[in-house]
UniProtKB/Swiss-Prot annotation:
Pfam family, one: Myosin_head
Tissue: Specifically expressed in extraocular and laryngeal muscles.
Homology family: Belongs to the TRAFAC class myosin-kinesin ATPase superfamily. Myosin family.
Subunit structure: Muscle myosin is a hexameric protein that consists of 2 heavy chain subunits (MHC), 2 alkali light chain subunits (MLC) and 2 regulatory light chain subunits (MLC-2).
InterPro entries: Kinesin_motor_dom_sf, Myh13_MYSc, Myosin_head_motor_dom-like, Myosin_N, Myosin_S1_N, Myosin_tail, P-loop_NTPase, XRCC4-like_C
Superkingdom of origin organism: Eukaryota
Name of protein: Myosin-13
Source species taxonomy: Eukaryota, Metazoa, Chordata, Craniata, Vertebrata
Length: 1938
């Protein structure tokens, strides 16, 4: 794990990659109980953390973090990993590996935004749904060249490892990024490409930019390919805003040195259906919305489009904007990518034009010609735009769409298309254009990325659409999910199967582990023969196959036979599903609608021909190789069977072929897996759904991958490679002189290295390693290389320096020689002979010079001749050179052409290799098919023999059938006559069903479809014959003898099918037609009768609805009148209270009117019920009729389809019979269809009428319910109003009484405050004096402590001087010895050192003298301070006497307090009762007013709802009128309607009379209000009497409280006495604390001295050792001094041992004393803090409480002081207990010391200690009892405080209620608030005083006795403590003296 400094290279990404070092250390040091910490299963969170409490048999009780106790089985509890494994980077390293550990590790890392985690051999990444700074350039640089274990987990680390493996292993690599849709695969793919483009750049830049050429570097183009492909291939889905709707496999090729060479992209299965259709929460491809973002306005003008996506239906069926995508910025990125990738401007414009044309295709509209099935264009403007953009003639394009040319036989005919067919054709063309353009762009990108540079290896990056489960899953989802299934199987096979198989193949001991991850069943269900794809392709071969036939074949073949194929359960609100597949990631429901068309992918070949002739080059190029019906034949003649086979390929076949190529590529590489996870479905950052993540982990095999990584050996190396690479670790293990094979060498090498034997295994050809060991070997190799390189560098540097040194020596010798010669010359230069020599020597050289001139002339002549020869030679050579250069150029041209040919040959070779792979796959498929055909052939031979036997019998049956045909013809004539009669009856009904002709036409089309089906069956037979002929031709090549038998078999099969079908058809069709005719006649009669009845009922309902409408209008008018009255009531309510009576009267009138209105509507409700019963009866009859008709129609259709299918098969032999029966069948079917349309029309009209009736009935019921609610509310309002008035009067009377009482209380309050202030002043003066004395005492003690510390410091300084002196003496001794040994050489140095030592000695002596003088002065100051302490103690005693006088005054004050408290209780009881009554009355008043306002609001809402109902009823009446117009027989029921109308008029008149009666009721309400007023007055008088009674009760309660207060006064006096005693004890304890502090200081001082001595002795010991070593070397010289030093050394050792013993003892004493002092100090500070806190609380209470309650507060404070004094005494006892325990420990230590020093005192001290032990034990027992009793008292006090808090909460609730009253009762606000405040204060004070008095009485009595006993015991303990202290001092003094 790297440190924070090493992580600095990652920049700001460091905290997102690895935990900081501090956090890791804290995690390791965190407390952790491995036996209790666990994970447990939980229903909500799946797994939660907990602590094991107990284990019982097989059950475990666990407490979770949210304090839940769970009882679980053992298998539901999982142990937790230690904290150091929190957020671990590789989950394979965890101690406990299970699901919750993996889940929580991922969750905690995700919470810290560490999204990458290793999981064994692969990496897991969680989508953060936010931007993280972990992909910056500095992060790329940081990961470059790093090993996996050296850097945190990251996609860059995976990429770099793949890159390094490619270079070292010389093998192709692949990175498989898998996961569900929205997991982040596309982003990680882009990061991988970014990494490779950064680290493996070639550095070559393009020098110039030309159109159509590369416009950027290779790495730029690789990176920019992503934005372009994402714009045209990515879209928003439900789970992902940028989902890849195609798969891609990006191969990045590298050269031999690892430099980037080229790249190419393979794409798979673009989802082209998204071009024309999107779900509501999705959108189409990004490019459409980027263009419409108007970032490039010139594109809008060029493409003739608008910026509103809703103008184009193809791209606006779902959402049109995505919050996380800026379409305008993405358009710029896409446009820039097109430029960088080298597209020419013409190609760029072509791309945009085709994209715009696809958008215009969605706007093309067509309509149906009048009286024809033919479609025609509905406007040509859109077609003109599309034609302009695509370079087409729009008229020809429209003609080709509406009337395409179709080949029939050898001729072409024009086929008519209906609107739906033309629309489908347009959509198919748009999808085809977009798909081909996308594939062309991929091809162009690959051309640009192919740099023709030499390439050695490649790394493939796979990014394919993730597993998808939508509400509507089609063929695209099946292909995507099948791809993911194959990839998951590849992962499982690679990780689990191949890995373990290789172990066995290599001979490693291994038990095969079945991880249960085999997905073969699902894969075989989809792709194997007779699988889903196989059945789909088989159905596509038949021209008229349907989705239903495809579904039936699937069910027949797989339902119930394969566990992975299921029948889906119908779900409400979801799309229909036809079958379900159980995939590894879940069960998916698939809808097969349109699969056959999608798979065949048919196009309008007429329009495609126009595309091929388009003036837009790009469009014509895209469709130039299209192989349709026209080109198929011609192509077939040219290239034979190959062209024909290629044109027959379906979409699924192409997809499977591409998928097989992909899997072949992946198997040829070394894969690296990255598993992407979705944390939640809501795209929320930082949130993790446990169930969702766990499902993905289980499906992806993460846990199994970790397990096999831990158990297996994931790393392996060939023996030769291992020997070559790691021999450097121990070269001596492999002998040099002899041959040894690689395996033995590797074994010897590994055995010689310090590596665990369990971490590796030896196979047959490789050595296998556990995870992490190979990295360890790499580190060891790196370390070895470092050492070897260092030694090599040292040898080289040494050699170079020796060479340099040799040269330097040679130069030095030369210099010496030159210097010697010059010196010699200088010496002889002035000699006379030398002068003569200088003069003669030049003369001697002149003769020699002449000789030299002669020789030079000769040489000059020779050189001249040679020059001439060389010139001639040069010219010859120049001529040769020119010719050679010409030859060289020719050779270079030849070499260049040869290299080009070689490159072409290599490309052809590569193409041949690829084609070879494809051909091998095809050969494999053909061999499989051949085997299947052979099996089928053998089966057919057997069937042929059986058919030969049956042939003879069938011939006999044919003769019988001919006889039956004659009978059938006779019966046919009879049925024709019956049909004529039926047609005459049907003409009578044609007038009533004129509007249903469209449905009739559709049924006729269905009839036409059945005829087409017959033709399809014929085509199928012909197709089967052709296929059979092909198979026979193939089998002829293998077995020629079977050819004749196959022909016979085909003939027999056809004869059999025709005969059997003819027999069934002729029998069943005749019987069915007769039965159908009779049933139809009967049903027609019934339907006519029911239709007439239904028409009459509808007319009745229409009349009723008109009447209802009139009534509603009248009621609405009346409601408006009531509204006006309510508004008048609102205005009157705002005025004076005198108008209340009028308002009540009006409300009463309204209530009476509403009651009468509700009574009137009851008659209407009864009538509605009658009509509803009639409607229900009619509905049941109609439903029964429709059900019967539908059943008969279904049976007719089914039987007809069967007969048609069977007739089609026997069309050759029974053609004449078939034609006659077809005519009869078509006529009967037309009649049946007409009848079905009539019945459906009737059912629709009936359902409409029923809906209108139901809505009217619901509206009337709602009006009635609302009327009843209104009357009830009015009644309640009147009752509340009456109660409110009575309460108002009572409150006013009571308020007056309370005001008088308040005035009396204020007067008494003023008198009390004056007395209280005087007492306060006295108390403050006394407390100030007492505090001043205490402060003086504390300051004196503090001064004493300071002086003591100064004394100790002086003592330490003195000790330091002594040590310095001893050190100086030792140095003098050393110098003396050295002086004696080196007297001659260092005489001067020793003298100087001696002088320095003398100076230092003198300084040391002066320091000792000054220290002694300071010690004397300190002793004097100590004595003076002791005198001052004694004076302060006397002052303290005087302050105690002053406190006693103050207590007397306080007792007098308590008496006055009791008197006033009695008065307080009386007033409190009265006010409390008054407050309760006023509060209840005010709440009732507020409720009444709120209810009144709600009633008014409801009236208003009723008015609005009535208006809405009126509008709805008017709409309903309009609908009923329309239905009435369509029905012609309404006049029959007019009389009934008129009668009902008269009844309704009578009911309306009754309603008006009831409303008038309501007005009279309002008058009666006024009288009742006056009576309510009188009753309120009477209730006020009763309340006054109740108040008087409450006053008397409160007086009695006050008397009882007075008696309680007297008892409290007595107890307070007792507490005062106890307080005095406690204060005395406290003083004694403080004195003891001072003694203990001084003793502690003395022990500390003693410890410091001992430590100083120890240091001195240690220094002496070191010096002695050094001197001993010197003396040993000079033993002969200083033998006498050596003896002296040895004696000194022995003395020092003895002293050292003594000081060591004393040091240990003193350290133990110091620890005990410091513990004791610390306890005493903490207890003392806690007591002081509690005392201060209590005093602050008392002061705060005195400030907050009103002046009238001051005396009671003083009493409370006295009680609290008594409690605190008792607690202080108990704490002092506990303190003494602790000191005694410490003294006992100190005693044990002192015993050991005393044994060594004085054996005589052993027995005496032991006896004393035993006696002390017994007393201490007694004291401890008693103290424990006291502590328990104090705990009980504290609990009671806590309960009392809870009660007080409870009352305070009640008071808060009262204040809240008072605030509400303040809003509602303005006139009573001030008075009620004052009363409430006073009552609250009085009540709280009385309750607190009463509770505290009761508790204090009982507690003080108990504590008093206990404290007396505790005081006695404390005296005994104190005497014992003093004795022990005296003994300890004696012992300490004795040790000091020794």
């Amino acid at each position: 794990m790297s440190s924070d400094a090493e992580m600095a290279i990652f920049g700001e990404a460091a905290p997102y990659l690895r935990k900081p070092e501090k956090e890791r250390i804290e995690a390791q040091n965190r407390p952790f109980d491995s036996k209790k910490a666990c994970f447990v299963a939980d229903n909500k969170e799946m797994y939660v953390k907990g602590m094991i409490q107990t284990r019982e048999n097989d059950k475990v009780i666990v407490k979770t973090l949210d304090d839940r106790m769970l009882t679980l089985n053992n298998d539901q509890v999982f142990p937790m990993n230690p904290p150091k494994f929190d957020k671990i980077e590789d989950m394979a390293m965890m101690t406990h590996l299970h699901e919750p550990a993996v889940l929580y590790n991922l969750k905690e890392r995700y919470a810290a935004w560490m999204i990458y985690t290793y999981s064994g051999l692969f990496c897991v990444t969680v989508n953060p749904y936010k931007w993280l700074p972990v992909y910056k350039p500095e992060v790329v640089a940081a990961y470059r060249g790093k090993k996996r274990q050296e850097a945190p987990p990251h996609i860059f680390s995976i990429s770099d490892n793949a890159y390094q493996f490619m270079l070292t292993d010389r093998d192709n690599q692949s990175i498989l990024i898998t996961g569900e849709s929205g997991a982040g695969k596309t982003v990680n793919t882009k990061r991988v490409i970014q990494y490779f483009a950064t680290i493996a750049v070639t550095g070559d830049k393009k020098k110039e930019t030309q159109p159509g050429k590369m416009q950027g570097t290779l790495e730029d183009q690789i990176i920019q390919a992503n934005p372009l492909l994402e714009a045209f291939g990515n879209a928003k889905t439900v789970r992902n805003d940028n989902s890849s709707r195609f798969g891609k496999f990006i191969r990045i090729h590298f050269g031999a040195t690892g430099k980037l060479a080229s790249a190419d992209i393979e794409t798979y299965l673009l989802e082209k259906s998204r071009v024309t259709f999107q779900l509501s929460s999705e959108r189409s491809y990004h490019i459409f919305y980027q263009i419409m973002s108007n970032k490039k306005p010139e594109l809008i003008d060029l493409l003739l489009i608008s910026t509103n996506p809703f103008d184009f239906p193809f791209v606006s069926q779902g959402e049109v904007t995505v919050a996380s995508i800026d379409d305008s910025e993405e358009l710029l990125a896409t446009d820039n990518a097109i430029d960088i990738l080298g597209f020419s401007s013409e190609e760029k414009v072509g791309i945009y034009k085709l994209t715009g044309a696809v958008m215009h295709y969605g706007n093309m509209k067509f309509k149906q010609k009048q009286r024809e099935e033919q479609a025609e264009p509905d406007g040509t403007e859109v077609a003109d735009k599309a034609g302009y953009l695509m370079g087409l003639n729009s008229a020809e394009m429209l003609k080709g769409l509406c009337c395409p040319r179709v080949k029939v036989g050898n001729e072409y005919v024009t086929k008519g298309q209906n609107v739906q067919q033309v629309t489908n054709s347009v959509g198919a063309l748009a999808k085809a254009v977009y798909e081909k353009m996308f594939l062309w762009m991929v091809t162009r990108i690959n051309q640009q990325l192919d740099t023709k540079q030499p390439r050695q290896y490649f790394i493939g990056v796979l990014d394919i659409a993730g597993f998808e489960i939508f509400d509507f899953n089609s063929l695209e989802q099946l292909c995507i999910n099948f791809t993911n299934e194959k990839l998951q199987q590849f992962f499982n096979h690679h990780m689990f199967v191949l890995e373990q198989e290789e172990y066995k193949k290599e001979g490693i001991e291994w038990e095969f582990i079945d991880f249960g991850m085999d997905l073969a069943a699902c894969i075989e269900l989809i792709e194997k023969p007779m699988g889903i794809f196989s059945i789909l392709e088989e159905e596509c071969m038949f021209p008229k196959a349907t989705d239903t036939s495809f579904k039936n074949k699937l069910y027949d073949q797989h339902l119930g036979k394969s566990n992975n194929f299921q029948k889906p359960k119908p779900a409400k609100g979801k799309a229909e599903a036809h079958f379900s597949l159980v995939h590894y990631a879940g069960t998916v429901d698939y809808n097969i609608a349109g699969w056959l068309d999608k798979n065949k992918d048919p196009l309008n070949e007429t329009v495609v021909g126009l595309y091929q002739k388009s003036s837009l080059k790009l469009l014509s190029f895209l469709f130039s190789n299209y192989a349709g019906a026209e080109t198929g034949d011609s192509g077939g003649s040219k290239k034979g069977g190959k062209k024909k086979g290629s044109s027959f390929q379906t979409v699924s076949a192409v997809f499977r072929e591409n998928l097989n190529k992909l899997m072949t590529n992946l198997r040829s590489t070394h894969p690296h897996f990255v598993r992407c996870l979705i944390p939640n479905e809501t795209k929320t950052p930082g949130v993790m759904d446990h169930y969702l993540v766990m499902h993905q982990l289980r499906c992806n095999g993460v846990l199994e991958g970790i397990r096999i990584c831990r158990k297996g050996f994931p790393s392996r190396i060939l023996y030769a490679d291992f020997k070559q690479r790691y021999r450097i670790l121990n070269a001596s293990a492999i002998p040099e002189g002899q041959f040894i094979d690689s395996k033995n060498a590797s074994e010897k090498l590994l055995n010689s290295i310090d590596v665990d034997r369990e971490q590796f295994r030896f196979g047959n050809t490789k050595v296998f390693f556990k995870a992490g060991l190979l990295g360890l070997l790499e580190e060891m190799r790196d370390e070895k290389l470092v050492t070897l390189m260092t030694s090599t560098q040292a040898v080289c540097r040494g050699y170079l320096m020796r060479v340099e040194f040799k040269k330097m020596m040679e130069r030095r010798d030369s210099i010496f020689c030159i210097q010697y010669n010059i010196r010699s010359f200088m010496n002889v230069k002035h000699w006379p002979w030398m002068n003569l020599f200088f003069k003669i020597k030049p003369l001697l050289k002149s003769a020699e010079a002449e000789k030299e001139m002669a020789t030079m002339k000769e040489d000059f002549e020779r050189t001249k001749e040679e020059l001439a020869r060389s010139e001639a030679r040069r010219k010859e050579l120049e001529e040769k050179m020119v010719s050679l250069l010409q030859e060289k150029n020719d050779l270079q041209l030849q070499v260049q052409s040869e290299t080009e040919n070689l490159m072409d040959a290599e490309e052809r070779c590569e193409g041949l290799i690829k084609s070879k792979i494809l051909l091998e796959a095809k050969v494999k498929e053909l061999t499989e098919r051949l085997e299947e055909e052979e099996e089928m052939n053998s089966e057919l031979v057997a069937k042929k023999r059986n058919l030969e036997d049956k042939c003879s019998s069938l011939k006999r049956d044919i003769d019988d059938l001919e006889l039956t045909l004659t009978k059938v013809e006779k019966e046919k004539h009879a049925t024709e006559n019956k049909v004529k009669n039926l047609s005459e009856e049907m003409t009578a009904l044609e007038e009533n069903i004129s509007k249903l002709t469209k449905e009739k036409k559709s049924l006729q089309e269905a009839h036409q479809q059945t005829l087409d089906d017959l033709q399809v069956e014929e085509d199928k037979v012909n197709g089967l014959i052709k296929i059979n002929a092909k198979l026979e031709q193939q089998t002829d090549d293998l077995e020629g003898s079977l050819e004749q038998e196959k022909k016979l078999r085909a003939d027999l099969e056809r004869a059999k099918r025709k005969l059997e079908g003819d027999l069934k058809m002729s029998q069943e069709s005749i019987m069915d037609l007769e039965n159908d005719k009779q049933q139809i006649e009967e049903k027609l009669k019934k339907k006519e009768f029911e239709l007439s009845q239904l028409q009459a009922k509808i007319d009745d309902e229409q009349v009723h609805s008109l009447q209802f409408q009139k009534k509603i209008k009248e009621l609405q008018a009346r409601i408006e009148e009531l509204e006006e009255e309510i508004e008048a009531e609102h205005t009157l309510r705002a005025k004076i209270e005198k108008q209340r009576s009028d308002l009540a009267r009006e409300l009463e009138e309204i209530s009476e009117r509403l009651e009468e209105a509700s009574g009137a509507t009851s008659a209407q409700i009864e009538m509605n019920k009658k009509r509803e019963a009639e409607f229900q009866k009619m509905r049941r009859d109609l439903e029964e009729a429709t059900l019967q008709h539908e059943a008969t129609a279904a049976t007719l259709r089914k039987k007809q389809a069967d007969s048609v299918a069977e007739l089609g098969e026997q069309i050759d032999n029974l053609q004449r019979v078939k034609q006659k029966l077809e005519k009869e069948k078509s006529e009967l079917k037309m009649e049946i269809d007409d009848m079905a349309s009539n019945i459906e029309a009737l059912s629709k009209s009936k359902s409409n009428i029923e809906r209108t009736c139901r809505t009217v009935e619901d509206q009337f019921s709602e009006i009635k319910a609302k009327d009843e609610q209104q009357t009830q509310l009015i009644h309640d309002l009147n009752m509340q109003k009456a109660r409110l008035q009575t309460q108002n009067g009572e409150l006013s009377h009571r308020v007056e009484e309370k005001e008088s009482l308040i005035s009396q209380l204020t007067k008494s309050k003023q008198a009390l405050t004056q007395q209280l202030e005087e007492l306060k002043r006295q108390m403050e003066e006394e407390t100030k004096a007492k505090n001043a004395m205490a402060h003086a005492l504390q300051s004196s003690r503090h001064d004493c402590d300071l002086l003591r510390e100064q004394y100790e410091e002086e003592q330490e300084a003195k000790a330091e001087l002594q040590r310095a002196l001893s050190k100086a003496n030792s140095e003098v001794a050393q110098w003396r010895t050295k002086y004696e040994t080196d007297a001659i050489q260092r005489t001067e140095e020793l003298e100087e050192a001696k002088k320095k030592l003398a100076q230092r000695l003198q300084e040391a002596e002066e320091n000792t003298e000054t220290a002694n003088s300071k010690c004397a002065s300190l002793e004097k100051t100590k004595q003076r301070l002791q005198g001052e302490v004694e004076d302060l103690m006397r002052d303290l005693e005087r302050s105690h006497t002053a406190c006693a006088t103050l207590d007397k005054k306080q007792r007098n004050f308590d008496k006055v307090l009791a008197e006033w408290k009695q008065k307080l209780d009386e007033s409190q009881a009265e006010l409390e009762a008054a407050q309760k009554e006023s509060r209840s009355l005010s709440t009732e008043l507020f409720k009444m007013r709120n209810a009144y306002e709600e009633v008014v609001d409801q009236l208003e809402t009723l008015r609005r709802e009535n208006k809405n109902l009126q509008e709805e009823i008017s709409d309903l009446t309009e609908q009923i009128a329309e239905t009435g117009k369509n029905l012609q027989e309404a006049e029959k029921t007019k009389k009934l309607v008129e009668q009902e109308k008269s009844d309704l008029q009578v009911a309306l008149e009754e309603v008006e009379g009831s409303l008038e009666h309501e007005e009279s009721k309002i008058l009666r309400v006024q009288l009742e209000l006056s009576q309510v007023k009188s009753e309120l007055d009477r209730k006020v008088i009763e309340k006054d009497e109740e108040i008087e009674q409450l006053k008397r009760n409160s007086q009695r309660a006050a008397e009882a409280l007075q008696s309680v207060l007297d008892a409290e006064i007595r107890s307070r006096n007792d507490a005062l006495r106890l307080k005095k005693k406690m204060e005395g004890d406290l003083n004694e304890m403080e004195i003891q604390l001072g003694h203990s502090n001084r003793q502690m200081a003395e022990t500390q001082k003693h410890l410091r001295t001992v430590q100083g001595q120890l240091k001195d002795s240690q220094l002496h010991l070191d010096d002695a050792l050094r001197s001993n070593e010197d003396l040993k070397e000079q033993l002969a010289i200083v033998e006498r001094r050596n003896g002296l030093l040895l004696e000194e050394l022995e003395e020092m050792k003895v002293a050292l041992e003594q000081t060591e013993r004393t040091r240990r003892l003193s350290e133990q004493e110091l620890l005990d004393a410091s513990d004791r002092v610390q306890l005493l100090h903490s207890q003392n500070t806690s007591l002081i803090n509690t005392k201060k806190k209590l005093e602050a609380d008392i002061a705060q209470c005195q400030a907050e409480v009103e002046n009238s309650i001051q005396e009671s507060r003083n009493a409370e404070e006295k009680a609290k002081k008594a409690i605190t004094d008792a607690a202080m005494m108990a704490e002092e006892l506990k303190k003494e207990q602790d000191t005694s325990a410490h003294l006992e420990r100190m005693k044990k230590n002192l015993e050991q010391t005393v044994k060594d020093l004085q054996h005589r005192l052993d027995e005496a001290e032991q006896l004393a200690l035993k006696g002390g032990k017994k007393q201490i034990q007694k004291l401890e027992n008693r103290v424990r009892e006291l502590e328990n009793e104090l705990d009980v008292e504290q609990k009671r006090g806590a309960e009392a405080l809870k009660g007080a808090h409870k009352y305070e909460r009640k008071v808060k609730e009262m204040t809240y209620q008072a605030e509400e009253d303040h809003k509602n009762i303005l006139r009573l606000q001030d008075l009620v608030d004052k009363l409430q405040a006073k009552v609250k204060s009085y009540k709280r004070q009385a309750e607190e005083a009463e509770e505290q008095a009761n508790t204090q009485l009982s507690r003080c009595r108990r504590v008093q006795h206990e404290l007396e006993e505790a005081a006695e015991r404390a005296d005994i303990a104190e005497s014992q403590v003093n004795k022990l202290r005296a003994k300890s001092r004696d012992v300490g003094s004795q040790k000091m003296e020794e």
